[in-house]
Structure formats: C-alpha cells, structure tokens
Amino acid sequence: MLSKTSAGLFAALLALALSGSATAQQPAAAIFAERCAVCHDHPTGRTPARAYLLPRLPSEIVHALSRGVMRTQAAGLSQEQMGALAVYLTGRPLDSEPDAKANSCAARGDPPKLGPGQWSGWGGGASNTRYQPNPGFGVGDLPRLKVKWAFALPGLTGEPIVAGNTLFVASRLGRVFALDAATGCTRWAFETESTMRSAVAVGALGNGTVATFFGDQNADVRAVDAATGKLLWKTHADPYPNAMIVGAVTYHDGRLYVPVTANDEADALDPAYPCCKFRGGVVALDAADGRIIWRGYTIQEEPKPTRVNSAGTQMFGPSGGGVWSAPTVDPKRRLVYAASGNGYSGPAVDGTDAVVAFDLDTGRRVWASQALAQDIWLYRCEGKAVGNCPDPMGVDFDFTSPPMLQTASDGKQVLVAGSKSGIVWAFDPDSKGKLLWRTQISKGGPGDAIWGLAADGGNVFAAVSGPSTIGPATPGGVTALALTTGKTEWHTAGPTPPCAWGETGCEHRQPAAVTAIPGAIFSGALDGHLRAYSTADGKILWDMDTAGTYDAVNGIKAYGGNIDGSAQIVANGTLFVNSGNATATSPRRGDAVLAITVDGK
C-alpha cells in the first residue's frame, strides 16, 4: 500500500505494471510508448519518472489525461484507453473515490464563522505571510502533539483551510470536502468538472453568507456556500484555451484576485503548435456574483507574429509570465502583487520572473521588478533550438511562491519572494519594487522556494530542497534570514532518517511550504517527517513521522507519505497536515489529512 510498502513489494508491483497479459497490456503499452515514454522514460526537471507513477491512483492518471495537464498528449484517446493506460502504469484496477456520505455529520452544526485563529487561502490571509499569531497552543506544548483523527482523501492537493469549526480540503480529482474540524465528520462534498491543485479561500458576502472560493485547471472559479456546499456562482476567468488556475485565489474586501497561468509550456512540445499567445496575469472578480471587474497582465505587450519555426509553424510573442501562486493584497498602497514565471517565447520582456504590482481598483500594471531577464523556457527543449524551442534556452527560474507583504519591527514594510533559483528576494513596495536584498540559500532547482516562505516580522523562514549554499551542501534544511537585511540568522541542516516505506524513493529534501507560529516554524520533508524548529536558533523542537497507516474517520485506511507542496497550517489549536501530497517529481504519495492536537484531544 502507499505508506508501508517495502522495496520488494515496490519491485513486484513495478513488474506487474510493466508486464501483464499480452492481450490486456499491449494496447496500453503501445499508447505509453507512442505518447508518454519520450518524457517519463527520460525524465528531466518537473517530469516524474515512470516508477514514480506507480504509487499513484489509477483515477489520478485518468484525471490527468482527461482533464489535467496531460490532456493534450491524450487527445483522441477513449475513456477505456485512458483507463487501460492508468491500470498499466499503476498495476492496480481502476479505483473509486471515497464515498462522500461516509461519516456524514449527524447534525449540520454552526455555520462557519470568520475571525481570529482561522486560515484562509494559501498564506493564511491576503498578505500571504504564512504566520499564525493565534495558534491555540504554544512552543511548550509541542512534545505533546498527537494525531487526533485522520481523513483519507486520495489525490489530496491544496492545503487545509479553516473557518470557525469547519475544515476545507481539496483533491486534485476535483472534489472539495467540508469537514467538522473537531471530529473529521463530513459536512458536505462538492465536485467540479476539472482537476484542482490549490487551496480554497474563505470570505463573507454582502448578505452575510460565508463562501468558499476556488479555481481549477479549466480556469473556472466557483463560489460555494461554506455551510451547505451549494454552488453560488461559476465564472470562466480567462478565455485563452490553455488557461488554468493552479494558485489559490485571494479574497479581500468583497473581491477575489485570481492568478492565471497556462499549459503552453507542455503543448509547445508539438512543433505544429503556434507558440505562444498567452500572457499571465491576475483577474479581479466580484465575490458576490463572480462578475469580472478587471484583468491585468504581467506582460504589457500583446503577442504578435514573430518567426517561423523549423517545422514551418508561425510563432508569436512575447508570451508567458504565468502566475502560479496566490496574489498578495496591499490595502495601504491600493496594489495587488503577483509573482510571475518564465517566458514561453520571445522577445524578452520585463514581466517574466518578476514581482508585478497591479492597481487594486483598475488592474493597471503599476510596476514590475524583474529578478531574471531572458528566461525564455519550454518543457523538454533541453537546449535544442528546434521546433518551438527558444534560442538561447532559459533556466526556468520562476517565481512560484506568493510574494509576502511583511511589516518589520520598525514599521517598514517589505515584499519577500522566493524563486526556483534558490534565491530569496526582498523588494521595497514604496519604491516601485526596488531590490532591497537577495540571498542565495540553495543551488536552485525545481523544488526550491516553490511553495511558500513564512515570516514573523523579524525573520523570513525558508525550507531548502536542493543542496544548501549556507550550511552543509546536502538536500533539506531550514534557513532564517533577517527581514530587513537578508542576513543569515541560522541554518539547520535536514536530518536523514530512514523512510517508513524503505529505501526506494526515500529522499530528505524539504520543498513544502513552511508555516510559522510564535516561537516555532513547521517544515515537512519528502521522508514524511514533519518538524518544528525554534525561530530563535533553528533547534528542532519536535519531530513526527507522518508516513504511517491510519484508521480514517471516513471508514477506510489513510496512508501517509511525502510532505510536499501544500503541507500544514495551524488554526484554533490544531495542526492540520497533508501527508502524501506529493507533487509531480515526489517519489511517495499518500492520502492522509491529519488533525494533530495537544495530547490528541
């Protein structure tokens, strides 16, 4: 199973996935060889190796092919062929998702309420600092933290969100569950027509209704009544055919700020694809009815015809600058900030790999502070100037975590963001994003600073995925930087315990988002361990191996695994953890949403 699989069982399942009867397996094998092998048998960057597909659920594979990022590669396949391919790759029969009615709450309970101690959106609020000032427990309670309950959610993705006594969790299979935060019983479940990757946001409408808001990979945004699960409205945020929403929407003062990116990086593998016409940006919606108020672009210039590629296809540019993470709202300056990704096609412009400021009321681009110029990159090009591939090829050093707006002890505000370069950047919001400092914390790569930093007013805290450039050159660890100067305050190298599932796929990198409370920060690792570190000196105060098997409250087994991507949040005295939220290149999936409290009470 997903949590305690030994190396021998892993090998046996792999043999099953790669062999099987000729009659049942050959069609799927041929499909894989024709459409998938070129990437998954020769993985680079974000591409998961073929063996990493084995622990996934067949339904995850089918969703990726039919609704998700692989839908272009799967074009023309029937549902039966997709199912056969999923069985071939995982070695398991097609599965079904958990029964949404299992362990339904006996009573509806009080409607969700907004207030201190809640956690909304990716960063806990519109400033995206990932800091919980009212955790409901203290540093002295850390040794007593124990699992209170577990919920099995195959395909779990966006981090847990809390409003009042309700916990909201989402699945990449397109389902959102509302659970009783105290017991884990199910209040309601909502299903979309697409895949999801991000957290939900919570906010109040003008009529007093508390709503949850979330986007999907079809670029649709929905508002759902937080008490009942009833759909209130649905809006298609961007008309571009490949547009998608993978970052959390941000709620502020009756409006939603929606990050938009696109799947062009993968689709441009086809030299017949006219790369590229997409510009990333932010869309502002009225939270009451979903009406589009404005749309702002990271790249100011509209794409125009540029060159004809080696296959004879007309190309367009500039393009790219997708926004992969939650926007950050600055009410004082009437701005909303977005962190942008690389360009897809030239000419190079200043809105890629940048922190971009938009007017909060109109969407006008006010300024852009670019960290890396000329970063034009497409998936699987690997420096080959053929087809749509850029020349020269960029390095894919996106800003992919939300910019944090943090106030220092002297009252000065600083914008901080991390990029895949392994660099943490600080910008001055009062000087059009002027660079204040930059600190290299790792060698950079696909897992570095992607998912989110945290700040407590004095320091910025960042987990390390690639080899550290501050401490020992080993993967994993946590670094604290002074908010106003970027000076390294401390670095704690990542421990390297054995993984609960054995040696295969056992890694100790720490790409997941970190979360801070007064006196401690939480950071998880790909080995399944969740640790609390002292904010003062980086000492490890608490360590829990989450990669176990749990009797879930919804009547099935839950399996822990990697801690990656969205990881943990703290609200109302409970530490909520996604164990097994592995991303594309994580080796070990699970499906456990854990509620951890003092003494498990």
Task: List each language-model region with its residue ranges.
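Sequence/structural segment immediately N-terminal to covalent heme-attachment motifs in c-type
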Residues: 25-42
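A structural motif specific to WD40 beta-propellers
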Residues: 146-148, 185-188, 230-234, 293-294, ...
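A short helix->beta-strand "capping" segment at the edge of beta-propeller domains
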Residues: 133-154, 310, 389, 495, ...
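Blade/loop signatures of beta-propeller domains
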Residues: 103-148, 298, 302-303
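Beta-propeller blade signature
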Residues: 225, 277-291, 351-364, 475-486, ...
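Repeat-blade elements of multi-bladed beta-propeller folds
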Residues: 116-123, 154-175, 193-221, 244-274, ...
